[in-house]
Amino acid sequence: MASKRKASAMATEPEEPVDPADELMFLNLGGGNEVGRSCHIIQYKGKTVMLDAGQHPAYDGLAALPFFDDFDLSTVDVLLISHFHIDHAASLPYVLAKTNFRGRVFMTHATKAIYKWLIQDSVRVGNTSSNPQSSLVYTEEDHLKTFPMIEAIDYNTTHTISSIRITPYPAGHVLGAAMFLIEIAGLKIFFTGDYSREEDRHLISAKVPKGVKIDVLITESTYGIASHIPRPEREQALMKSITGILNRGGRVLMPVFALGRAQELLLILDEYWGKHAEYQKYPIYYASNLARKCMLVYQTYVGSMNDNIKRLFRERLAESESSGDGAGKGGPWDFRFIRSLKSLDRFEDVGGCVMLASPGMLQNGVSRELLERWAPSEKNGVIITGYSVEGTMAKQLLQEPEQIQAVMSRNIAGARRGPGGDAEKVMIPRRCTVQEFSFAAHVDGVENREFIEEVAAPVVILVHGEVHNMMRLKSKLLSLNATKEHKVKVFSPRNCEELRIPFKTDKVAKVVGKLASIPPSLKEAKTGHDGPLPSSTEPQLITGVLVQNDFKMSLMAPEDLREYAGLTTTTIACKQRLKLSAAGIDLIKWGLEGTFGAVEELPEVKPKLEIVKSENGDTKMEEADEELPHGDDVVAAYLVMGCVTVRYRASGEVELEWEGNMLNDGIADAVMAVLLGIESSPAAVKRSATKNPHTHSPLPADKNPHSHLTPEDRFFRLCMFLEAQFGQDNVSPIVEPKLPPLSPTTKAITSPSEETAKSSDVKSDADADASMDVSEEDEDEQQLKARERAEVERLERMGIPKPGVRIKVDKMEAKVWLEDLEVECANKIFRERVRAVVERAVEVVAPLWG
């Protein structure tokens, strides 16, 4: 019996938190676990890209659209259309005309050319449908009005839109089909759309972009892990089935998309008919309203096709020139045995024929009408050559039902009412044969897996596939992780299921301009060049302006902004003037130094001034008689904090000047506050009110008023500091000093009263007998008091008014002895707290007892 794994072995390692800006958001609005209405959203670093905008061929009206209401389309920057098929492009007119989409739309030139006619034909077919349940979500006018909004681009060209880089590559699915490489902030995302790696007669097969490291691969999973039969065997089986139906006198219906695989099948049939003359009596029709219009597009874009079609083009052109035919004939798309059928009104339904008709899903149009007409005959046959979407008539036919519902025509011979009394439901018996040969131009399981392995992206997102096919491919890809060192993450989100994948990228700034001339640090020098190493090993600091453009960061000096970033810088010089009526230059300097510390005196040009003495002995500065130029009356100028210049003029006007920025503005505000309050400040008034001595001797230097404090003042300030920390009622002075331990020296020191007592003891024996009556306790008490008095006197001589301070908080008590600032307390925590406060108090009141 297998042992059960421990929970610890199954637990995942905790992941570091990720910034939401570093997460890639992926959302399927359509095409998630289904085929049809493909529409995907990718969002990264504030940029949004929409991939495809199709309709579901099995649904009608709004139900066929992607879930546009689940996302704000106004945030989309770029919409990329991979190819012109209905399930990838048919809802684009709705997005452009009916929603708040404001981005730009891109597709290849061939896709745009065919898209115009294909969507226009689709709208017209929908208008002529006899199905009462069908409804159009946009009109032909909407389509033609929004068509100029589409921008066409070429393969292998890179375009930058709103910091998003896109590059289309050939997909090999249909003419103009593209795979897109999308780069956002260094993250490379590759979207395949529908793609094919099979070599066919006219398209270039899909290839992996060379020299590109892809981070996320978004790929189709249409066929899951199923494998296709080799191409020659499929073509042989297809022609055997077609000729078999013709040989029994039947008609062959091949439902195809108007453009895409139909052209490949036409090339196969035209080549086979040219080699087998016995079948040239059977006409081959291409029934599509778009046949002639879109074949011109194919003839135009021969240059974007593969070498086979180019070779055929040269051969046909040479044959045409040798036979003398007019120019423009004999190209690879000028078929010899194919007839274009614009409508069924001109079709004579007599005898055997091969009919390629659109649409490929048999939901409506010419192909559905012919199916309802030919289904009752067992001689006829239907051959499905493309992928059949769930819910469509093509998918139902593969199950070979006994009868089908009439949609295009209800009065056909043999038709009868459906069960249940539903008068609107007309059923037609199906007796024709149904066969399937895959020419869908989608990769099979092997090709898809090889492509994914070749891309080697760490993250793979599967789209465009039915649930069972997608899950099989996902399981196969995950099983390959067993042999890989770096595991691949595979996701298959459903519609409207938001997927978030973290991608952490290093932010690297390129140093340009003058800063680039600074030599690299020691570490860089060791690995960057072979020259001598710099002597300094200190980390190198560089100051500059960091500029981000298109997710690229550059570090440069401010003076290089114009050259390297296209930006201009502006310096704002701010000035402020105020008039002081009483404050002189000395008082202004004193106030600035008291607030900002040392100020730098600037060497400003000073005018000629006279010193005039007033009656009370004050001196003041007066201007000389001669006129001075404007601006030259500056008495003194100072630089505050290295950024604010203060100029004092003879008129009493003070001017402030500084370079405007957030820091300098704050310092200038502080200087203004000092100047506006300097005339009313008590300290300034006291200082300015001092009379100058009537002597010619130099004035004594200004002294700090707090430099000469009495011991009582210092003790008071200490107590005030402690009361602020522990409370006023919890701090009290200690009167009794802390006595040092007794020593012979201490015993020899006695008070004057003790010396008098000793002399009296020597004089008379009677007094000695009386002293013997005194108890030893009284003698010890007197001696203790004498020692305390001596200790207090010693402390006072040192300038310590009180021996100590007692601090009580709740039940805890601490004593602070001021001589050595020793703290006594039974509680260790409280003792350390008191010691820290006392040390801080000493720093504030310091020097405390010096």
From Swiss-Prot:
Gene3D superfamilies: 3.40.50.10890, Ribonuclease Z/Hydroxyacylglutathione hydrolase-like. Keywords: Endonuclease, Hydrolase, Metal-binding, mRNA processing, Nuclease, Nucleus, Zinc. The active site is at residue 442. GO terms for molecular function: 5'-3' RNA exonuclease activity; metal ion binding; RNA binding; RNA endonuclease activity. One of its GO terms (biological process) is secondary metabolite biosynthetic process. It comes from the Eukaryota. SUPFAM superfamilies: Metallo-hydrolase/oxidoreductase. Residues 767-781 have a biased composition (Acidic residues). Its EC number is 3.1.27.-. Belongs to the metallo-beta-lactamase superfamily. RNA-metabolizing metallo-beta-lactamase-like family. CPSF2/YSH1 subfamily. Component of the cleavage factor I (CF I) involved in pre-mRNA 3'-end processing. This is Endoribonuclease ysh-1. It comes from Neurospora crassa (strain ATCC 24698 / 74-OR23-1A / CBS 708.71 / DSM 1257 / FGSC 987).
